[in-house]
Swiss-Prot record:
Lineage: Bacteria, Bacillati, Chloroflexota, Chloroflexia, Chloroflexales
Protein name (Swiss-Prot/TrEMBL): Probable molybdenum cofactor guanylyltransferase
Species in which this protein is naturally found: Chloroflexus aggregans (strain MD-66 / DSM 9485)
Gene designation per UniProt: mobA
A GO molecular function held by the record: GTP binding
GO BP annotations, alphabetical order: Mo-molybdopterin cofactor biosynthetic process
Free-text note regarding domains: The N-terminal domain determines nucleotide recognition and specific binding, while the C-terminal domain determines the specific binding to the target protein.
Catalytic reaction equation(s): Mo-molybdopterin + GTP + H(+) = Mo-molybdopterin guanine dinucleotide + diphosphate
Length: 208
């Protein structure tokens, strides 16, 4: 696994968790002595990136998080606003972007994304095994993506999956999944309490 590439790691952490009912970022799925969800996300990116940024609305609540905290430029604007804020704040030409609520991302998949060659503004995988839905919160963005995303945002769009179609983006294709995550477990996220039950069941039967 590469160590400290000249690439930023950006975690979109938000802060509302309205559908979840509690602050899911503080869940300790790996035991009381283990990391919380947000700490785990930081730990995933640290070996790969020269800096790790966390975009969130409540930086004051995370004084001990070992990352650079970035205030969302447009609080309440969703993941698109978070990605824009992260790209604006990063100090490298490229960023590996993930969401804070994806607890079972395969580290080897992240490393592969970080090294995957591509031309354009972004490297955005499609869902697997049934392609079609882009995964813009498990992706690589160049700084060149910032201006078009800002334009789309200014035009009123708030859906990240729609906004990224304004970019010159590349899909690494099914080979990425087949080589590094054939079950596509990395796409599991926590949006509702029912999602938590699924992830807990997965963690109970898988060594992660």
């Amino acid at each position: 696994m590469p160590v400290h590439m000249m690439m930023s790691g950006i975690i979109i952490a938000g802060g509302r968790s309205r559908r979840f009912g509690t602050d899911k970022r503080r869940l300790r799925l790996w035991g009381e002595q283990g990391p919380c969800l947000l700490e785990r996300a930081v730990a995933l990116l640290q070996p790969l990136c020269s800096e790790v940024l966390v975009v969130l609305n409540d930086a004051h609540a995370w004084p001990d998080l070992p990352a650079r905290l970035v205030a969302d430029e447009q609080p309440g604007s969703g993941a698109l606003g978070g990605v824009i804020s992260g790209l604006q704040a990063m100090q490298t030409p490229t960023a590996l972007v993930i969401a804070a609520d994806m607890p079972v991302i395969v580290p080897a998949l992240l490393a592969a994304l970080a090294q995957w060659p591509f031309v354009g503004d972004a490297l955005i995988p499609s869902s697997y095994p049934h392609p079609g839905q882009l995964q813009p919160l498990l992706a690589v963005y160049r700084h060149s993506a910032l201006a078009p995303l800002r334009r789309v945002f200014a035009a009123g769009e708030r859906r990240l999956q729609v906004a990224v179609t304004a970019l010159h983006w590349v899909d690494p294709g099914p080979e990425l999944w087949q080589m590094y995550d054939p079950t596509a477990r990395s796409l599991l996220n926590l949006n509702t309490p029912d999602d938590l039950k699924l992830v807990q069941a997965y963690l109970g039967t898988t060594n992660i």
